[in-house]
């Protein structure tokens, strides 16, 4: 056997047929924020009217969609993030460039699955949507200091994230 033939005999097969893990992705709001239920309601409505599927297909992420549970917005009586956002007139979304979730088009505008869904939430709130590039390692601090209102960027919902954000 030649060297190449011998190598092929011992070539490793790195193909796995089993799924090793399942990751869940989502947006992150401040702990106790009523913005969480507003986003959940908006996502549920977008699923019901077909908007969620259409946006997912536009960016090729439809296989990642999960069923959105029915959700009704519950406003906080004290320290409402929704009221705060409406008062200032802007939903500030913390992102990083992460296609197909958030990235810039040829004109420098933010697009992507998460960017489009964040714009939909801002539209439902009746406010402008502003995207701010954040240092990913400081995302919780950015939220807590109100530099941003939501982290929305293909974020894996780890135990650490779930403990620090809604």
Residue map of PLM features:
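Hydrophobic/proline-rich hinge and linker segments of small-molecule sensing/allosteric domains
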Residues: 27-30, 92-96, 166
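Periplasmic-binding protein-like
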Residues: 38, 42-63
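Structural transition elements
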Residues: 69-79
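A bilobed periplasmic-binding-protein/Venus flytrap-type ligand-binding module shared by bacterial periplasmic
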Residues: 18-42
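A short acidic, helix-capping loop that chelates divalent metal ions and anchors anionic groups
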Residues: 26, 100-105, 161-162
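Extracytoplasmic small-molecule ligand-binding "clamshell" domains
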Residues: 49-54, 58, 78-155
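Local pocket/hinge segments that shape ligand/substrate recognition
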Residues: 19, 56-71
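A ligand-binding cleft/hinge motif common to bilobed small-molecule-binding domains
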Residues: 1-21, 138, 154-164
């Amino acid at each position: 056997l030649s060297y190449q033939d011998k190598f092929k005999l011992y070539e490793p097969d790195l193909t796995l047929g089993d799924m090793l893990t399942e990751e869940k992705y989502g947006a992150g709001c401040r702990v106790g924020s009523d913005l969480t239920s507003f986003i959940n309601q908006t996502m549920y409505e977008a699923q019901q009217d077909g908007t969620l599927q259409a946006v997912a297909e536009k960016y090729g992420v439809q296989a990642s969609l999960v069923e959105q549970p029915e959700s009704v917005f519950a406003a906080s009586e004290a320290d409402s993030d929704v009221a705060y956002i409406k008062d200032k007139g802007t939903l500030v979304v913390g992102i990083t460039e992460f296609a197909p979730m958030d990235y810039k088009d040829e004109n420098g505008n933010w697009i992507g699955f998460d960017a489009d869904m964040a714009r939909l939430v801002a539209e439902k709130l009746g406010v402008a949507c502003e995207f701010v590039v954040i240092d990913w390692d400081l995302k919780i601090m950015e939220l807590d200091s109100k530099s941003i209102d939501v982290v929305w960027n293909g974020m894996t919902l780890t135990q650490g994230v779930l403990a620090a954000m809604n």
